[in-house]
């Protein structure tokens, strides 16, 4: 999200990254580490079926710190917040043992109403305590499942609401908003080379069903849920583009 609030030297600034342990948030963490002087991460345990993603976070953080000494210096504290209530009030295929289907409203049954709105609110509250002005999220409306809380208009509205409601000057960054999954892999390569791509491929998690014991060329997963299909298609385009270059 473009803004005039970003200082000339963001290395003097701190950022909070919404960090689930997935491909998108891992790429966003690398993006933030390349730009801000102190970067902290926050993950949310809301009763998701794919809670295995939370276990991936530490390995990704450690791996990124090992890739670049500057990143190691900038990488700050990790936070995990329990949001059990979100899982309690949500009757979705991400928080219940239910089949993934398409609802009558055109949204997949994996949509958790209000999830990103709640995540951003808690991230802003944490940022206030930790002295961070920048909040980074992996929301995207290019290669995505149609979730309304991933849209650019939603993020812009949340930035306004958070700043009004907290009398602050937060800047919400969504570096993946207008790129697809293939371009997300390409961004990771640009940020940290083939080593970062390999780290994200091997250690991040996208599968909605939490399948971790099956490894594909594009990463772990069941291979059939919407998240796996998006990740696989993006990887295949990324590899094909590389082969054509």
UniProtKB/Swiss-Prot annotation:
Keyword Ligase applies: yes
Gene3D superfamilies: HUPs (3.40.50.620)
Reactions mediated catalytically: 7-carboxy-7-deazaguanine + NH4(+) + ATP = 7-cyano-7-deazaguanine + ADP + phosphate + H2O + H(+)
InterPro entries reported in the protein's UniProt record: QueC, Rossmann-like_a/b/a_fold
Residues that coordinate or bind ATP: 19-29
Keyword tags: ATP-binding, Ligase, Metal-binding, Nucleotide-binding, Queuosine biosynthesis, Zinc
EC number: 6.3.4.20
Cofactor note: Binds 1 zinc ion per subunit.
Binding residues for Zn(2+): 207, 222, 225, 228
Cofactors named for this entry: Zn(2+)
Pfam families with a match to the protein in the record: QueC
Similarity section: Belongs to the QueC family.
Protein's UniProt name: 7-cyano-7-deazaguanine synthase
Source organism phylogeny: Bacteria, Pseudomonadati, Pseudomonadota, Alphaproteobacteria, Acetobacterales
